[in-house]
Amino acid sequence: MAMTEESMDQVEVNCLCAQHAQTCTRPRCFAKEGLCANWFYNPALAFEGFDIPDSYQEGHGVDIEVKCSHHSSKLCHNGHDMICSYSRLGSHINIRCICNKPRPHMSLIEAACSMYNLN
């Protein structure tokens, strides 16, 4: 597979995100805001006689990188002109599923959106 080609699983994640964006009713939605959910799959490792790093976590899921952002807008409240602004630090959302079907599924996307709304 060429480096520029997306895996079939990533294509499926992209389709699930597009479906989610059409039906999501949350105040904020990573899919509607154009953030990309990146697919990963870490199979179970069974190496006899070898140590498996503690940092390795088997499962499948999506990663979303949330960049830093700043927003400001002008608001008139009770006859007073105000400039309101907020800054959001960057973050990383990781949703890892350990079910026995390592394929993209809508539960991953829904969980990612729930976490995005906690951010």
UniProtKB/Swiss-Prot annotation:
Domain of life assignment: Viruses
Name under which the protein is recorded: Early E3 13.3 kDa protein
Source organism: Canine adenovirus serotype 2 (strain Toronto A 26-61)
Organism classification: Viruses, Varidnaviria, Bamfordvirae, Preplasmiviricota, Tectiliviricetes
